[in-house]
Amino acid sequence: MLSMLKRDFWYDLPKELIAQEPACPRDAARLMVLNQKDDSIQHRIFRDLPEYLEPGDLLVVNNSKVLPARIVGVKQPTGAVCELLLLRQVKGDQWECLAKPGKRMQPGTKVSFGDGSLTAIVDETLEDGNKFVTFYYDTETLYEKLDEFGKMPLPPYITKQLDDQSQYQTVYAKELGSAAAPTAGLHFTPELMDTIRAKGVNITEVTLHVGLGTFRPVQEDEITDHKMHSEWYSVSEETAKLIHDTKAAGHRVIAVGTTSCRTLEAVAAKYGEIRACSGNTDIFLYPGVKFNCIDGLITNFHLPESTLIMLVSALYGYEKTMAAYKVGVQERYRFFSFGDAMFIRGGNGTEGKK
């Protein structure tokens, strides 16, 4: 494979094309359909998706639920305002957090939130500046307190506050643990999912808890030097069997979102098949890497030079992906987390080597 540089994945995007709020209704977002067989592009609405699905196809969605993990509190006893962003559970009520202002939150610092029924003590400062923090509360679970006091950790390019926190959750989200939404799934409504199932298309779930590393820019010039962040995933027996049966019958496995895609490809690369398992993955999919599971991908339009546009290029082909993004800008598609979607139809990743 020819070496590729980060700048190869740059494209110019007018700021006004960065979506600040989701489409309403969700399935009114636009859908760019990219056809592997003839390289044609079609411009549709997301609710038209069932027209491009066939009986026996399998959609794989990520059921991870976003934590309202950004909480603002005051340091005790000074009353200075500070902020914690919960990144991952370490053990019990101890979490790794991003703290602001980090330098003023040394081990032993106590913080109270809201009416004081949620407090936290900083245990340790890590090499990267993150903190280990233990939480104390008067409810059965910490999640109840986060629902009460927390805010959704929106990406930095979204500057508008949400009218409703559920706008940043998929309709099928149930496994709490993500620091960001698996955004391709935001376009689905219960009615659209019913329509898809009525066509004979199966829908199954995996879990991958999206970390804030998904927003971390690639620093290295040579993309192969980039080290991916690690994220926890889980695949059930039911999902593994459905994927096996779908493949055996000659039908397509279509990942809804890059997180579902990375989960399936990580498991397939590790075991040579999809099996029930859980663990952590730092899989990096870029042009030249072979796909071993998925036959199609539903995804949003991603940031320039991000690992996600590299993933799309790996599946659809670098030149074709960058051309499609150029068309997206020309046609005034809405970009990033609350933006429009694309559906890469057909192909099992072999085209991505071009």
Predicted regions and their residues:
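Surface-exposed, charge/polar-rich loops and edge strands
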Residues: 2-354
